[in-house]
Amino acid sequence: MKIDRDAPIGVFDSGVGGLTVAREIMRNLPSEKIVYFGDTARVPYGSKSKETIIRYSRQIIRFLQQQQVKAIVVACNTASAFALDAVRDEFDIPIIGVIEPGAKVAAAQTRNKRVGIIGTVGTVGSGIHAEYLKHLDPEITVFGKACPLFVPLVEEGWLHDPVTDEVAARYLKELQDKQVDTLILGCTHYPLLRSTIRKIMGDGVCLVNPAYETALELGRLLEEKGLAGEGTEKNEFPYRFYVSDLADEFKAFANSILPYLSLIHISEPTRPE
């Protein structure tokens, strides 16, 4: 089956966190169109079982295929950890996650071989980052810390709030004590807290933003497969966003962090089957 290189990229997440990945694709791959699905009716994924996350991911990928996408980005660390292998085996379309691109950069950047990973309970508990980092460099020691309150704080829009500062300081103290020199922001919500995390961890710690690294990895994948967009097909709304609930709240959040707002269309809630 011939894939149209000017077809859009499918991106999905449990909610608004994946917008950080969409933002980096918009910035770094300006010839690409995007169809985004935020599963806002079922957020968060971090507390759900592997079987449930695989089922949700299958439903969303089928929905994105109906939108004629040419590749899919699983812009959710939890879904990348639990569902990526299953959906790659099942669907005949290029699919990438957000874990491997960030881990590659962390392995290259660390000087003392002590790498921290923060994420949801599910992501950190999966051990997938540690497994991949150890594969890249067996000498690396990985310290994981689940930060379950970060997602609701971001979803509430409390990006620069004393409560968020206090919560972050408590979570990150353990990693400070472990003297990590590289920290993977292992949830797509977390780059929105980058300034808070930077303030606590200090300038000596390299903060790895998997959203940015994933956009670059996507660009390489598209070039390799001859699918890079040429940007010749004009479209009133090259960026289309779908959610399963709370479209107004999603729209307000998207408006606060995304560029090119005049090119974005956000649809009313839809439920993938």
Predicted regions and their residues:
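Non-catalytic structural scaffold of enzyme domains
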Residues: 1-267
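Short "domain-exit" segments at the C-terminal end of structured domains
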Residues: 268-273
